[in-house]
């Protein structure tokens, strides 16, 4: 080739390149293009095709998570990508500016392509891909369309998200949840409108549309808060009757579930404890008795949420009171406390939200009363009614997931056993509690817009009620409170404006060098994971309880407490010469492990009513064990008075939705120690093989402790073999649920009782407060109010079976309501939040079982400006709590 020809060829090549560049074309780089294809769910194992500016095509296949990589060598830009998912055909435009960056394909990139190309339908977009008319689009036009989509999403959220074209994210799959960026894909629909985008209502991807139901209640015969029972009915010691106890209707189960869950969270046992005077359905938002029976009319919508396999799912519910004002919308989350079902927070966050005209977003967070009777192969459905497991399929609230052969073999070896959802789902649902709470908020926005928005000519409903114009408070008590805190940590979309919680079960990831002081005393052990301190308490509480005279519920442990002391001494875990010395030593061990003198008299009732059950459920859930694993020799079953296993009657399962708390023993299902001497027996009556004593299954308790620590608690030897493998699973599960305390500057209130024996403040509230203050630094807006003479179970206070709670303790629920009021005023009106403080209450006193009426003088308010002697301070890594 002569020089003249080479120069002419070069000139033509440069001119061609300039022409291609002017219309967005040009040679692509040899680097691979990569990204994620999703439509809420990952578009897995699907063909993704790229067409270039001159009609060349190249294809690749996405992996199981929707990820792809495509070599662009030789292709001319712009490219148009196309992939077919279960919901449609999706496209993305890629320019030279996108090389080296993530290039996703999803419903958002499809919308961007529509606007960039000036098209009005999906069919037109597919035609553009086929005929190549996209070749004229410029990189600037694509970027402009993407910016307009982000403008619309910012108007929706109140904060600008990352570009869904290029953000790296984790989509949901059939058996795992996606991250918050993935949730945004189906939080709201978008479509081009003029030079920008309109947003419209969309059912979130994770919600099962075929499970969705909605019911309106008139506020008279039935209602949202009291199920038609009113203040008087909730106060009755007699639960509502069933027309046929063997087959209650869904409406009857709902009424009984509301009755039992309300009374389980607040003290409604007697009017002397504050019900009907300080709190309750009849008390208005100003604290006055003006609401009569307190029934609240409105809409209730409910659905399953989770993966498509049905293995990992939670229940979501939204209650919208008739007083809801769409011009001033508000949402309160009410994630269930404990392992309770969907109505588990009805009496706490539910009541507060409904009275304030807010929609209430509930979730059972993947626990609840999911019972599988393995002998009869029956399960409960979403509404609590009973069905055969095969008939229910994945719509069962929970199924153990055993094949017929596996179930038959297990039934033969361990007859009449029960599988329970929180313990045996093999999903470790606690890792998703924050996400479940955020899903409940997203579901609330969907329900509200379905109710209040008006469809346009296309039949779609523009978003009227959005995160940007809605006040959202994450709230609840106990496990629900921990879920609210985790939701706030995970909230990348700005759905939550503030947090106000009570007695949170929250597990700090690490305190590091942080210290906690009460008065002048440094707490020796703090910030331990839940199962760590529970397995420790499970060893020593029965014996320690004997050191505290006048303990409420002491009679419940009388049959095994002394034997527990004796057995611990025999194993070298106590050294006292007699029972009294052993009990004192056991109590000292609890003091050294995070409990304090405020808890001494409550250890008896807690071991009798809570500790072993929580140990067994959480041991199973953290290790993702099956019911067939019988971890540490424990199982669930109905038992006879002598403690032997007996068949569970159909009536037990028929009513479990209403009476169960999600953690056996509950509703007729007890905790059984399979390995007891003489055969399987209820745990509190079990004789341990290694001791020969009826010591409430100490051998099982020691096994549980070993799985948490990784070593034998008696010999100190490291675990090996099967026990080591089980321990590694349990400890991995614990790591999955720990919090990092990064609240991102969200205003947050934590209210806890100093006398909380179940979730000691040194391990939870105090520890989390210190860690979060350290993590967020100057940006922290976390406030902590510690209430003296208050604890975890308000329902114990005036319980006839626990005299002495009433004389010693005040209802923490009063301060939960105050915390909610403070947060609401802060978010709505800019009112200042009081500084962290100790609130010093006065117990009612009097005679155990008949304490005098409580009054406002027993319950001073959270002070706007606390006295110096009551101020809680955090400085230089030390949390200082006044004595």
Features from the language model and the residues they span:
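Bacterial N-terminal signal peptides that target proteins for export
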Residues: 2-11
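A short acidic-Thr-Gly-centered motif at the start of a beta-strand
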Residues: 24-26, 740
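General secondary-structure edge motif
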Residues: 3, 129, 133, 137, ...
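Feature for extracytoplasmic/surface-facing segments of secreted or surface-associated proteins
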Residues: 26-195
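C-terminal His-loop and adjacent cap/lid subdomain of alpha/beta-hydrolase
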Residues: 194-883
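C-terminal motif of bacterial Sec signal peptides marking the signal peptidase cleavage site
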Residues: 19-22
């Amino acid at each position: 080739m002569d020089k003249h020809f080479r120069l002419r060829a070069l000139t033509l090549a440069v001119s061609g390149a300039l022409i291609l560049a002017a219309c967005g074309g040009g040679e692509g780089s040899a680097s691979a293009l990569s990204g994620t294809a999703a439509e809420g769910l990952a578009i897995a194992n699907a063909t993704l095709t790229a067409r270039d500016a001159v009609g060349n095509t190249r294809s690749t296949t996405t992996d199981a998570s929707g990820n792809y990589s495509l070599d662009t060598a030789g292709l001319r830009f712009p490219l148009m990508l196309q992939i077919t998912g279960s919901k449609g055909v999706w496209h993305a435009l890629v320019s030279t500016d996108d090389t080296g960056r993530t290039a996703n394909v999803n419903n958002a990139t499809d919308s961007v392509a529509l606007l960039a190309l000036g098209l009005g339908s999906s069919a037109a977009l597919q035609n553009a891909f086929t005929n190549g008319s996209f070749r004229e689009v410029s990189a600037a036009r694509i970027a402009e369309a993407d910016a307009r989509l982000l403008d619309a999403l910012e108007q929706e959220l109140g904060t600008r998200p990352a570009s869904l074209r290029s953000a790296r994210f984790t989509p949901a799959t059939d058996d795992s949840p996606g991250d918050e960026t993935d949730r945004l894909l189906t939080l709201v629909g978008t479509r081009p409108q003029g030079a920008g985008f309109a947003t419209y209502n969309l059912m979130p991807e994770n919600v099962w549309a075929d499970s969705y139901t909605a019911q309106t209640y008139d506020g008279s015969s039935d209602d949202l808060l009291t199920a038609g029972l009113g203040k008087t009915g909730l106060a009755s010691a007699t639960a509502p009757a069933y027309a046929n106890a063997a087959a209650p209707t869904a409406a009857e189960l709902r009424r009984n579930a509301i009755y039992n869950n309300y009374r389980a969270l607040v003290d409604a046992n007697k009017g002397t404890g504050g019900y009907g005077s300080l709190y309750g359905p009849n008390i208005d938002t100003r604290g006055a008795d003006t609401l009569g029976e307190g029934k609240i009319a409105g809409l209730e919508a409910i659905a399953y949420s989770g993966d498509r396999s049905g293995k990992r799912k939670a229940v979501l519910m939204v209650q919208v009171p008739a007083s809801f004002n769409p011009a001033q919308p508000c949402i309160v989350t009410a994630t269930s406390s404990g392992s309770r079902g969907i109505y588990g927070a009805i009496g706490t966050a539910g009541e507060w939200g409904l009275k304030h005209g807010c929609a209430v977003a509930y979730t059972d967070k993947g626990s609840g009363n999911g019972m599988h009777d393995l002998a009869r192969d029956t399960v409960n459905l979403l509404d609590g009614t009973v069905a055969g497991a095969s008939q229910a399929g994945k719509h069962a609230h929970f199924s153990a997931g055993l094949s017929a052969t596996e179930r038959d073999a297990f039934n033969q070896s361990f007859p009449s056993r029960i599988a329970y959802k929180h313990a045996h789902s093999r999903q470790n649902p606690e890792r998703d509690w924050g996400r479940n709470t955020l899903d409940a908020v997203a579901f609330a926005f969907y329900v509200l817009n379905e109710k209040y928005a008006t469809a346009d000519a296309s039949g779609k409903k523009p978003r009227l009620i959005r995160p940007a114009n809605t006040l959202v408070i994450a709230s609840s008590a106990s496990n629900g409170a921990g879920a609210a805190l985790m939701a706030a940590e995970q909230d990348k979309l700005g759905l939550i404006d503030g947090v106000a919680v009570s007695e949170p079960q929250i597990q700090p990831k690490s305190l590091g060098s942080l210290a906690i002081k009460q008065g002048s005393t440094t707490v020796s052990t703090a910030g331990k994971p839940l199962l760590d301190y529970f397995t420790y308490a499970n060893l020593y509480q029965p014996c320690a309880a004997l050191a505290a005279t006048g303990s409420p519920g002491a009679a419940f442990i009388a049959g095994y407490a002394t034997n527990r002391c004796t057995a611990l001494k025999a194993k070298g875990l106590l050294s006292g010469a007699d029972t009294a010395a052993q009990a004192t030593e056991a109590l000292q061990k609890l003091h050294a492990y995070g409990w304090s003198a405020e808890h001494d008299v409550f250890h008896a009732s807690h071991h009798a009513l809570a500790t072993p059950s929580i140990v067994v459920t959480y041991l199973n859930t953290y290790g993702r064990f099956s019911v067939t694993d019988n971890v540490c020799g424990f199982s669930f079953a109905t038992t006879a008075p002598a403690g032997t296993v007996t068949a569970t009657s159909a009536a037990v399962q028929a009513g479990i939705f209403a009476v169960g708390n999600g953690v056996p023993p509950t509703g007729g299902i007890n905790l059984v120690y399979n390995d007891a001497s003489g055969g399987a027996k209820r745990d509190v009556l079990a004789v341990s093989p290694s001791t020969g004593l009826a010591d409430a299954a100490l051998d099982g308790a020691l096994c549980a402790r070993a799985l948490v620590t990784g070593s034998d608690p008696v010999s100190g030897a490291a675990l090996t073999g099967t026990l080591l493998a089980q321990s590694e699973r349990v400890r991995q599960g614990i790591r999955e649920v720990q919090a990092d305390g990064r609240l991102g500057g969200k205003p947050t209130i934590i209210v806890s009782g100093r006398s909380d024996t179940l979730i000691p403040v040194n391990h939870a509230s105090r520890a989390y407060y210190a860690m979060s203050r350290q993590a967020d630094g100057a940006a922290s807006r976390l406030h902590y109010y510690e209430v003296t003479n208050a604890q975890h179970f308000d329902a114990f206070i005036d319980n006839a079976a626990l005299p002495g709670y009433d004389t010693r303790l005040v209802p923490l629920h009063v301060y939960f309501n105050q915390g909610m009021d403070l947060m609401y005023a802060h978010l709505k009106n800019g009112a200042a939040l009081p500084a962290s403080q100790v609130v010093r209450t006065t117990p009612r006193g009097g005679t155990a079982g008949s304490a005098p009426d409580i009054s406002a003088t027993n319950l001073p308010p959270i002070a706007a400006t606390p006295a110096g002697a009551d101020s809680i301070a955090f400085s230089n890594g030390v949390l200082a709590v006044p004595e």
